[in-house]
């Protein structure tokens, strides 16, 4: 086999691997979003309280940090991904019920869902179409997350509405950046793990929705 044929074969393999990774990731992402929505609906119907919220949220992140990295390359990893997204969906129920108690709550939730969908599809589509490598954003995004977490923790004690609004705006920008970054990773890491890719994109969407909902509520003048 000539050098040209060898390079061509490797290029074809990379393209096939990339297409498979993208297909598997978006298929699983769609399934987990649906599963998460069902879990949220169940949580809303059950009218679960704060304890269930914190347990679900905490359980999901324990799975993300301690279990998923060890199971991502096994069949068990798929179950872990659904457990994570199901728990986060269940934790979302009390939040949605809180917003639904507002006179325009259903409208705000609908706008947040629509806005989240538009942002995700636009940015992800842009990254896939242009095939740009956004890996250079990694350091900036990681730093931004640390700053946002510190600000959120501080605001638990300070309870400053303007700071909450600023944090939500910052998180929306950060999650938008992460969508570009994570989508780009699928293109430039053809042998990446689709389970990890799915969880990354799911978390981007989840956080984007939560903070967009908070921002829209603040701008609507509702407490």
Predicted regions and their residues:
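A hydrophobic alpha-helical transmembrane-helix feature that marks the membrane cores
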Residues: 1-223
């Amino acid at each position: 086999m000539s050098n040209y044929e060898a390079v061509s074969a490797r290029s074809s393999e990379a393209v096939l691997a990339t297409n498979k990774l993208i297909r598997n990731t978006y298929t699983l992402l769609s399934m987990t979003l649906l599963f998460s929505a069902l879990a949220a609906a169940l949580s809303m119907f059950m009218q679960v309280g704060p304890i269930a919220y914190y347990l679900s949220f905490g359980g999901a992140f324990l799975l993300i940090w301690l279990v998923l990295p060890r199971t991502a390359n096994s069949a068990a990893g798929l179950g872990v991904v659904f457990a994570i997204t199901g728990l986060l969906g269940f934790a979302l129920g009390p939040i949605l019920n809180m917003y639904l108690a507002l006179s325009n709550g259903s409208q705000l939730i609908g706008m947040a869902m629509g806005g989240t969908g538009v942002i995700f599809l636009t940015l992800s589509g842009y990254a896939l179409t242009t095939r740009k490598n956004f890996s250079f954003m990694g350091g900036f995004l990681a730093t931004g997350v640390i700053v946002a977490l510190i600000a959120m923790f501080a605001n638990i004690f300070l309870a400053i509405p303007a700071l909450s609004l600023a944090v939500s705006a910052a998180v929306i920008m950060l999650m938008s950046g992460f969508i570009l970054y994570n989508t780009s990773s699928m293109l430039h890491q053809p042998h990446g793990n689709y389970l990890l890719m799915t969880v990354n994109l799911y978390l981007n969407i989840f956080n984007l929705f939560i903070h967009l909902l908070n921002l829209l509520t603040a701008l609507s003048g509702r407490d």
